């Protein structure tokens, strides 16, 4: 295990799956704060925040449209206003469309690329 004492960690897509596991591991490793983002299920995000806090870390859940630059900027501003820094960023948010390649519509492909490529780029840049 590693130590994250005093570190502020942000995990996009941290309200479920691998993102949730990483967020909880950061809390278990002594992070000062773990911030998670969610897209649709605020109640699940709140539940994860409560789990994070059982390990002594502060938590915050922020709604994020990962493909939207304004949403990303708002998220970063909220985190910096509350914690003044971000030490660890995990670009975990992502989407997929379950379909055969021939059945994927152009709009679906554009959405996938916006969330999975554009989102991490802008989160890292901001």
Q: Model-derived features: where do they sit?
A:
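Flexible N-terminal pre-Rossmann segment of NAD(P)-dependent oxidoreductases
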Residues: 1-10, 28
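Conserved glycine-rich cofactor-binding loop
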Residues: 8, 15-17
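Conserved glycine-rich Rossmann-like NAD(P)H-binding loop of the short-chain dehydrogenase/reductase
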Residues: 31-47
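The beta1-alpha1 cofactor-binding region of Rossmann-like NAD(H)/NADP(H)-dependent oxidoreductases
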Residues: 42, 63-75, 106
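A glycine-rich helix->loop->beta "capping" turn
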Residues: 55-58, 77-91, 97, 108
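Substrate-binding pocket helix/loop in short-chain dehydrogenase/reductase
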Residues: 100-101, 105-113
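A short, exposed helix-loop element centered on a Lys and neighboring polar residues
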Residues: 124-125
């Amino acid at each position: 295990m590693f130590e994250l004492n005093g570190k502020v960690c942000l995990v996009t897509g941290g309200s479920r799956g691998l993102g949730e596991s990483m967020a909880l591991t950061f809390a278990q490793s002594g992070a000062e704060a773990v911030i998670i983002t969610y897209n649709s299920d605020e109640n699940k995000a709140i539940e994860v925040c409560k789990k994070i806090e059982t390990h002594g870390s502060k938590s915050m859940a922020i709604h994020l449209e990962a493909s939207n630059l304004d949403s990303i900027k708002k998220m970063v501003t909220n985190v910096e206003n509350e914690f003044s820094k971000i030490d660890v960023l995990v670009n975990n948010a992502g989407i997929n469309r379950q379909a055969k390649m021939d059945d994927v519509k152009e709009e679906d492909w554009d959405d996938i690329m916006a969330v999975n490529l554009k989102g991490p780029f802008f989160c890292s840049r901001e």
